[in-house]
Amino acid sequence: MVMGLSVVFVCIVCCLFTGLFMMLSEKRGLDREKCSPYECGFEPIGSARSPFSIRFFLVAVLFVVFDVEVVLLMPFAYMFFYGKSVLGILSSSGFLLILFVGLYHEYREGSLEWVG
């Protein structure tokens, strides 16, 4: 009980000090140097803000999401090899169903079409 209260007390004190320091700190405006892009110490040549394809960004995000989900499927393969429990099979089937529903939604939305 004492340990739990001490952790809560330390968190409250940290939050109070953080708020106090934020209120008392000096506010500085952004100058031109802070807003300019940094290019290895050299003066920037041209604009660093090049146009970026939103379609490519969406495909990259989808790749990362589905790649992480494939990594989350690895324990299910281990479970199928060493232990065959009904709960494990149902949970992995539910996870795969959610994966395929998400993939179907992205397909129907048109996010997987590169040209369109």
From Swiss-Prot:
Its EC number(s): 7.1.1.2
Keyword Electron transport: yes
Transmembrane segments: 1-21, 56-76, 85-105
SS bond partners: none
Leading EC class: translocase
Subcellular location: Mitochondrion membrane
GO cellular component terms given for this protein: mitochondrial membrane; NADH dehydrogenase complex
Family: Belongs to the complex I subunit 3 family.
Name of the protein: NADH-ubiquinone oxidoreductase chain 3
Source organism per UniProt: Mytilus edulis
Lineage, broadest ranks: Eukaryota, Metazoa, Spiralia, Lophotrochozoa, Mollusca
